Design a protein with these regions (language model features):
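Cofactor-cradling patches in redox/metallo enzymes
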Residues: 1-108
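Radical SAM enzyme [4Fe-4S]-AdoMet core and its adjacent flexible, acidic
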Residues: 11, 185-203, 207, 315-347
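Glycine/threonine-rich flexible loop motifs
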Residues: 52-60, 153, 249-255
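Conserved SAM/AdoMet-binding glycine-rich loop
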Residues: 73-74, 82-83, 169-292
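N-terminal [4Fe-4S]-dependent radical SAM core
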Residues: 97-130
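Canonical Radical SAM [4Fe-4S] cluster-binding loop centered on the CxxxCxxC motif
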Residues: 125-158
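Conserved alpha-helical substructure of the radical SAM core
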Residues: 149-176
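Terminal RNA-binding accessory module
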Residues: 325-404
Length: 404
């Protein structure tokens, strides 16, 4: 029996695509293996958001070729879209598919390796990522995504709800809505729709316990939307915002058309309406022209904000973007600033988690390891409890006895 594995780099949208492919391949009799060094086909869904992402993809191709030389390697995703010839010329790579050829990728694998009889379904993830949107209509000066993903495109309501109902029947209790720019959802549909309209349908699905949103752009969040999310028990109290920076000068250089005052308003109103929510943000350090004063503004803003964690990224020039030719901050300064923000994030997150010591919370089993259950709560607390025998995606109730 032929087998496949999928390695996704980068965003949750890539993860959602891989999740969907895994289900389809299994329904056509191809066995899922988690170990890429043991599978017949290795599909790489690549990322090109940073130079480091590019390097990670190329290193993985080399590792697979060295440790699993008989595997057929397929490369797709954003790095393949940006530089397809790089992989087409690589003798280690069997085939390359651009982002708009991912349906062809699935067809190729099924026609080459599929059977009429499905294999027993093996969950690819403990929570089901569901892609509802792709692409972006904006051109932030640092971002290559619009070039490799195209303009915003939304899935229709009926297709999404049908997919979610099928996942619930398979036993999934939580879905994670993903997209390149979730807040643009529905604007391109006819008639036009919106993310709140879609959520209003999804929350009515029986036996669906949790809906988690991946990343939200504060530029498109109003009080009505925040009120809706905060007031619905099925929508997880977990907000992840694409902030990037808070200094007005740097925000303008990034082409993001928002102010730090608007950021503050959104964050504080979200905290007011959802006091127990986990609130995170993406932050870019070292953007060209970032002065000490700009960084001090960023640090002070984050320190005073209700955010409970942040993902810190070093600025990485991307070919074809408006900022690519600008001189960035020197490496030593950038590393120092990044370290300061990561330490601040660690302290803020510990402070947030300590609030829930001795609390009893529900959650979803992510995995079982060494006779312990790893559980994720709706507000993004990762809890380890003694126990075994619970399959992934099960609902459990836990008491948090200590915080580390």
């Amino acid at each position: 029996m032929r087998s496949f594995s999928i390695k996704s780099f980068g965003c949750r949208t890539n993860q959602a695509e891989a999740f969907q492919w895994a289900g389809r391949f299994q329904s056509h009799g191809i066995l899922l293996k988690e170990d890429s060094y043991q599978s017949d086909i290795v599909i790489i869904n690549s990322c090109t958001i940073t130079q480091r992402a590019d390097a990670d993809v190329r290193n993985f191709v080399r590792k697979i070729s060295r440790r699993n030389p008989k595997a057929r390697i397929i490369v797709t995703g954003c790095f393949a879209e940006r530089d397809p010839l790089l992989f087409m010329k690589d003798p280690k790579v069997w085939k390359v598919f651009l982002n708009n050829e991912k349906d062809d990728l699935q067809k190729e694998v099924i026609e080459s390796y599929g059977k009429n009889e499905p294999v027993k379904y093996r969950p690819f993830r403990s929570r089901a990522p569901v892609k509802i949107q792709d692409g972006c209509d904006f051109k932030c000066t640092f971002c290559i995504i619009p070039q490799v993903r195209g303009q915003s495109r939304s899935e229709r309501h009926e297709k999404i709800t049908g997919r979610v109902r099928a996942l619930v029947r398979k036993g999934y209790k939580e879905i994670v809505l993903t997209g390149i720019h979730l807040c643009l959802y529905g604007r391109d549909l006819e008639p036009a729709s919106s993310l709140p309209e879609l959520l209003s349908e999804l929350v009515t699905i029986k036996d669906l316990k949790y809906i988690r949103l991946s990343s939200l752009d504060p530029r498109f969040l109003d009080k009505e939307f925040i009120d809706f999310i905060a007031s619905n028990e099925k929508i997880c109290p977990h907000f992840h915002f694409s902030l990037q920076h808070t200094s007005g000068r740097i925000i303008e250089k990034m082409g993001r058309k928002i102010t730090s005052e608007k950021y503050r308003e959104v964050l504080e109103y979200t905290r007011e309406k959802s006091p127990d929510a986990s609130m995170g943000a993406d932050i870019i350090v070292g953007f060209p022209g970032e002065s000490g004063k700009d960084f001090d503004h960023l640090y002070a803003f984050l320190e005073k904000s209700p955010l409970t964690y942040f993902h810190v990224f070093s600025y990485s020039p991307r070919p074809g973007t408006a900022a690519a030719g600008l001189k960035g901050v020197d490496s030593k300064t950038e590393k120092k600033r990044s370290a300061l923000l990561r330490e601040l994030s660690r302290r803020k997150n510990l402070e947030f988690r300590k609030r829930f010591e001795n609390a009893v919370l529900d959650g979803v089993v992510i995995k079982e390891k060494h006779e312990n259950l790893h559980v994720l709560t709706p507000n993004y607390l990762k809890v380890v409890v003694p126990g075994s025998g619970c399959r992934r995606s099960s609902l459990v109730r836990v008491r948090i006895t200590s915080v580390k």
